[in-house]
Amino acid sequence: MSRNPFDDDYRPSAASSTMPVKSYTTMGHYSGEDEADYYEREIEKTLQESLDSTERSRRHLENSEKIGTSTAQQLLEQREKLENTEKNLDEIHRTTQMTQRNLNSLKSFFGGMFKNKFTKKPQEPTETPTVPQSKSASRLSETATNLSSGGGSATFSGPSGQRTLTESSRSAIKGTRWEAMDNQIDENLDMMSANLRNLQRLGADLGKEVDSQNEMLDRIQYKAERNDGIVRDQDKQMQKILGTGASTSQTTAESLTPSMDTSTKMSLMMKATSLWK
């Protein structure tokens, strides 16, 4: 029969007196020394995880920065090719103007041998326009050069003053290996911040350069289509001159110089043509 343990005459049984007293503390049966070791391991585990995480993030950002710099270099090389293409198209246009002048002279020659030599000459070909210097390309080149010469930490200027731990916590770990780990974490965070600023500036410069090159592509397309139309028209003019004017010129030359051979006639025609240039 069970007895009330609060009775004055209650005596514990032999079995109950040998049972251990249950502990309700969070550390269970740990001693004070074991508890301190436990917290030390937890602190070091947390710091190590933070250190590893910032190291990985820093490497990823540095790699992204290198990719961005490489993209900038490729974009600048592409601009150089586009500029050369535009210059060539401008030179072709200038050549077509000279060709048109010669065609007009040929038309005048075949249309009338005695046309007034003092007739106003066709307009001189305009000078080849120069491709304007791009501000976006200059800025992008400067940014890419700075990042390439300085690496991922080109703009890193030391600790920013912001710390991951409070002053009291830093004082508690001063002189321990944890202080070195915390310092490395702070340095990684500062470098990550610098990488992010570099990427932000690089991204803005890349965007402006892409917009500028898109405008250049529109100009190139217009000039290519313009030159193609002019060349086609001049080809038709030349075919017309060769089809109708050549026979008239040949008849005139034969009537004036019946004894001339073909090469002499062609030479005479070329000299006559030069008079109207």
Curated annotation (Swiss-Prot):
Cellular component GO terms held in the UniProt record: apical plasma membrane; neuron projection; plasma membrane; presynapse; recycling endosome; SNARE complex
Parts forming coiled coils: none
Signal peptide interval: none
GO molecular function, one term: SNAP receptor activity
Record organism: Caenorhabditis elegans
Family: Belongs to the SNAP-25 family.
Domain t-SNARE coiled-coil homology: 44-106, 179-241
UniProt protein name: Soluble NSF attachment protein 29
Subcellular location: Synapse, Synaptosome
PANTHER family hit by this protein: SYNAPTOSOMAL ASSOCIATED PROTEIN, SYNAPTOSOMAL-ASSOCIATED PROTEIN 29
BP term (GO), one: synaptic vesicle fusion to presynaptic active zone membrane
Keyword set, alphabetical order: Coiled coil, Protein transport, Repeat, Synapse, Synaptosome, Transport
Composition-biased stretches (Polar residues): 14-28, 134-170
Positions of region (Disordered): 1-30, 49-73, 117-170
Functional description taken from the UniProt entry: SNAREs, soluble N-ethylmaleimide-sensitive factor-attachment protein receptors, are essential proteins for fusion of cellular membranes. SNAREs localized on opposing membranes assemble to form a trans-SNARE complex, an extended, parallel four alpha-helical bundle that drives membrane fusion. Plays a role in the processing and secretion of the aspartic protease hrg-7 from the intestine.
CDD domains reported for this sequence: SNARE_SNAP29C, SNARE_SNAP29N
Primary location class: other
